[in-house]
Regions:
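Active-site-adjacent betaalpha module
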Residues: 2-5, 27, 31-34, 56-173
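Short, glycine/acidic-enriched capping/hinge loops at junctions between secondary-structure elements
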Residues: 18-19, 55-57
Length: 173
């Protein structure tokens, strides 16, 4: 029977520190995790391994998953080095092994790993929901809220011959 998965992208101690509305986003991620678990889905925590950015170097304190995430022993963990959570990782194989057809995308950073993973998941044939209140970024030359709003709109309107990315808040999943 087809299942769903929550992908929690890079919600690590070192990346969530300066995140816009970080605690609210963690709550939305946990809500999404709970919904997927209730329907016998799977949860995948994806951790970015960075070779030169110390907070995300493997096994540093900042590399660990955010302490407020609803983790459980049965959750899957994937390590990546790219903005694409599927690139040279076992993620696609794990999805196949668990009969996953639908993915809920959450995490950080909206304009990098969240965006890229959403697009790649769609191209790989998954049904994709971007949790609109479950992803974030930090302020840069563009305010974080503007980046989030922009990506929610762009990804919802992305052209694809077989499917679209659904964008919905955690309360409407």
């Amino acid at each position: 029977m087809p299942r769903s998965a929550t992908l929690v992208i890079d919600a690590q101690i070192g990346s969530m520190g300066g995140a816009y509305e970080g605690s609210s986003v963690i709550k939305a991620i946990n809500k999404t995790i709970s919904k997927v678990r209730e329907s016998s889905g799977v949860v995948v925590f994806i951790q970015h391994c960075h070779s030169s950015y110390e907070p995300l170097m493997k096994d540093n304190t900042g590399w660990g998953l955010h302490l407020d995430l609803d983790k459980s022993p049965e959750a899957l963990v994937v390590e990546k080095e790219s903005s694409d959570s599927f690139y040279e990782t076992p993620l696609d194989d794990l999805m196949a092994e668990n009969d996953v057809e639908h993915v809920y995308i959450t995490g950080i950073q909206t304009e990098y790993c969240v965006d890229t993973t959403s697009r790649v998941a769609l191209s790989k044939g998954y049904s994709v929901t971007l949790v609109s209140d479950g992803h974030t970024t930090g302020d840069s030359h563009i305010l974080a809220q503007a980046v989030i709003d922009h990506h929610n709109k762009v990804l919802a309107n992305l052209a694809h011959p077989k499917s679209r990315i659904r964008v919905a808040p955690s309360d409407e999943l």
